[in-house]
Amino acid sequence: MSRFTWIQTGALALSLIAAPAAFSQTKKAADGAAEWPMFNRDLGSTRYSPLAQISTKNVAKLARAWSYKVGTQKNSGSITGGSEVTPIVAKGVMYLTTNTDVVALEPETGKVLWTYPASGPGNLSRRGVAYWPGDTNNPPRVIFTMGRRLIGLNAKTGKVDPGFGNEGEVNMGVAYDSPPIVYKDTLVVGANTGEAPSVGDPGNTRAFDAKTGAKKWEFHSVPQPGEFGHETWEGESWKNRSGVNNWGFSLSVDAERGIVYTTFGGPNTNYWGGDRHGDNLFANSVVAMDAETGQRKWHYQVVHHDVWDYDLPPAPALLDVVINGKKVPLLVQTAKTGWMYILDRVTGKPVFGIEEKPVPQSKVPGEQTSPTQPIPVKPPALARNSFKADEIVTAADTNEEHAKFCRDLMERSGGFTNEGPYTPYTYREAGAAPHSTILFPGSIGGVNWGGVAADPKLGYVFVNSIDEASIGWIEKKANGSAVQYDRNSVVGPTSRFQWSEGNPRSGNIQGSGEHAWPCQRPPWGRLIAVNAKTGDFAWSVPLGVTDELPEGKKLTGRLNMGGPMVTAGGLVFIGASNDRRFRAFDSRTGKQLWETKMDMSAHSIPITYQGKNGKQYVAIISGGASALDDPAPPGTEALMVYALP
């Protein structure tokens, strides 16, 4: 679907580690190792940096080098409130978007090189920019989105480049809030469509010429008559269907084979599919297509007929590993489902097995859920996918106030029903007493847009997951509503306990912010390393602390949004958790080696880069300002940059 639908909590921010080109430093720098030239650092979306100056031996000494304010946005109360920008570093310059401008900075100091004040229709991307290196006839360009507009700036001057599109602009047709991925002279973008109604803008993936801005191709995310997969939409349900979009922050490309991989979310509407019987391709799928033509090569659908809002937000990571003596080209895809799908990226076939397993069926009028869903044999689930009554939080886990709230919530909800993975929401007749499904993972995951980082040398894939429920039922909506059936619950959009020191709040509050705790026993968030050679967990640790709890109980793991990056120095860096921390872990063992506390949580992707001074830096956007966080004082959203003394 579009970003996040019915949500219990939310916040976003981007962790970054930038990498400017150090022209006269080392051979590594000359080879591009010093840079972070795109959102996920490379076309394969590994977020792996070969820099190793900062290592397991010295990371404990990491200290703030400089910072740069990126905005004054106030808490919006929604999951999309704060900055999610990942800066990029290309040819010795850092580029990023703030809340109002596109800026170029000196990556060693934060000195402003130029500023482009964004204006006109559409919202400036809160996720960053792309860099195209130019050619003999065109200068290097910084390319970004504003609603339906794709805009190209001269990377050296920050001025609009009139040679791109129509005086520097291209109309994409559908809004997109992320930077395009740049492959050779092709720009590929997703789409941000609404959550409802079922008809509206298409979620198609599109490509444009990086030189001229001309449209190159468009892939129909909902197959049209005569196209592969059209029969998975019964009757006329395909017509003008919205959703089924790549709303995430990037795509991936196998440069050797010229294949671009796009992912799609579920169809509109989120929780009822009675007007769209069938498996609904290419919803909830990863699709491999020819980067030059947009022609489908293969697809893999991870959820059939989605009625849980189980999108595939992140780009897949591409890496090669040796399995049973043979080099295998892997594609590693995560999703809100809480599973990791490891496929051969050339054929689309599962590497460790994925089985179609029977799942519970919906009793909502008109609904026809799929009798089976694809469940990986390996790796194990990354997030909780079931719930039993004795797994509700107790005073021994946190405190009595929290435990009582959760017991009361279960009672007010009419009890909790859970039948394991893909439990359908219960149906509530008008006037009937409430009885609620408790669904794990909930609608924020699982694994959300933060995705994974992959170390191709070690063969490990790193991912942060969320153990958070959605609670409620499906009910018929009044005539005139945008949907016939939709979700509801006894507590509105959230179902978490809000803690206030000395004054626990009653159960009718929204349960948002840093002091809102889930009702199942911890951990509530984890950082996991998966051995891509075997499909097994290498290690798993709680990610985040609850400061209000006493020693011995603090390490609960936290709700998180954002993702990791990994370096040749043996380190995994990640913000993401809503406890205002930025951390470094040993990539081999999962041992935490460093942390710093910031003004706001960093729901973003970190980056690392080497400056022209030969020093390695680590950077991340500390943005907060959403429903995962407490309200932020104006001006606290910042780019935070760290280095060794």
Predicted feature residues:
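Mature N-terminal segment immediately following signal peptide/propeptide cleavage
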Residues: 26-73, 86-89, 111, 528
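Bacterial N-terminal signal peptides
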Residues: 8-19
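Segments forming glycine/polar-rich beta-alpha architectures that bind adenosine-containing cofactors
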Residues: 431-467
